[in-house]
Amino acid sequence: MSSFYHGDALELSIFGQSHSPAIGVTLSGLPAGFSIDMDELGAFLRRRAPGQNAWSTPRKEADLPDFLSGLVGNVTCGAPLCAVIHNTNTRSQDYNNLIDIPRPGHADYTAQVKFGGFQDVAGGGHFSGRLTAPLCIAGGICKQLLHEKGIEVMARIDAIAGIEDTSEFLAPVDRKNFPVTSDESAEHMKAAIARARAEEDSVGGLIRCQITGVPAGLGEPMFGGLENKISQLAFAIPAVKGIEFGLGFAAAGLRGSENNDAYRVEDGRVVTETNHCGGILGGISNGMPIVFRLAVKPTPSIARTQKSVSLSAMQNAELNIHGRHDPCIVPRAVPCVEAAATIAIYDALKASGI
C-alpha cells in the first residue's frame, strides 16, 4: 500500500487506519531550527476534528498530536518528524457486515480486490477520511513555514448541495466553524445538510482555495507543474473527485480573447488584469494568486438501504450501514485542502531555493 508523497524536497508518509490504535505521519525535509507554534497547530487541527457540531459525525476525537521524533522542545532538529494521533473513540463492530457487503461509493470493494480480503474495513480502514488528520499535521507545520515567507493559503466552502457562497472573494473564514463568507448562504447550506440527514442521505459540495504571496517563476513544465503537485496532494483527501484551476472547465466555452489574462505593469511588477488562469501558466506561477476549486462527493455511508452484493455468495444484496458518519464532509475538508496545497507549495519553494 503506497501512502507516500515523494516530493522534490519533502518526503511524506501517512500511516494507520481509522480504528487502529493510532494514525500518524512522517515528514522529512523540514529545515532544522524552526519553532512550531503548537497552539496555532492545535487550532488548525481542531478545524478538521470530528464531533463538534450538527453537520459532523458524532464520533468525538481530541486529535492531539504526539510527536515521537524530529523535535527538541518544539523546535525542528533536522531528523525526520514523526507524529501520531491516538484513536480513542471507535466502534468497530458497526462495520462487521461490510466485510461481505461493500458500500456503494466507498473503497470497500476496490480494497477487497486489491488486498484479497485482508483489508481493515472498520471505519473505512486506511481509506477513511480520518487519515486526513495526520495530513493536517504536516500541512499545519508547512503553513507556518510559508507564513514566514509571506505566503498564505486560505480555503472556504464554495457550494454545498448546489447552494453557492454569494461572495467571489476569499475573506478570512478560518475562525468560523462553518467556513463560508456569506452568513446567509451558510444558513441555507446548513439547512440542506439537516434535510439530507433527516432523509437518511448526504450531500457534497465545492471548496475554493486561494494562495497569495507566491513569487512568479515557481514550478516546472509538464510533469513538475504546480497544478500537478497540488492535484496529487489534493486527491489524497478521500472525498475529492475533481479539481479545476482558475476558470477551469468554464474556459472551454470561451474565446481566446475572453479567456486570456491581459498583462500590465503595476508598481514596478508585471500583473494580469484578470486571473482566469488561476495564477499558473505552463505549470509555473505568474505571481498572481493561485486559485483552484475542488469537487467533494457526498459521503457514501448513508443510513438508507442501498443496493450492493454479497461477495461470499456472489449474489445481489441490500446493505444497511451502521456506525457514525458525516452527512456532509465539505466543512471539515476545508482545512485538509489548505494542508494539501500548503505542502505542495512549500515543497516546490524549498526545492527551488527561493
Go through the PLM ranges and name each one:
Residues 44-104, 108-110:
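Glycine-rich, N-terminal phosphate-binding loop and its surrounding beta-alpha-beta segment
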Residues 15, 21, 200-203, 207-316:
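Glycine-rich anion/phosphate-binding loop at the beta-strand->alpha-helix junction
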Residues 1-59:
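N-terminal, positively charged regions that mediate nucleic acid binding
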Residues 11-16, 119-131, 216-220, 275-281, ...:
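A short glycine/serine-rich beta->alpha loop
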Residues 11, 301-354:
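Internal helix-turn-beta structural module
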Residues 99-125, 307-325:
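Short acidic, glycine/tyrosine-flanked loop/strand segments centered on an H-E-D-like triad
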Residues 114-222:
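Glycine-rich, mobile lid/loop segments that gate access to catalytic sites or pores
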Residues 21-33, 129-151, 224, 228, ...:
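Alpha-helical support elements that line or immediately flank enzyme active sites
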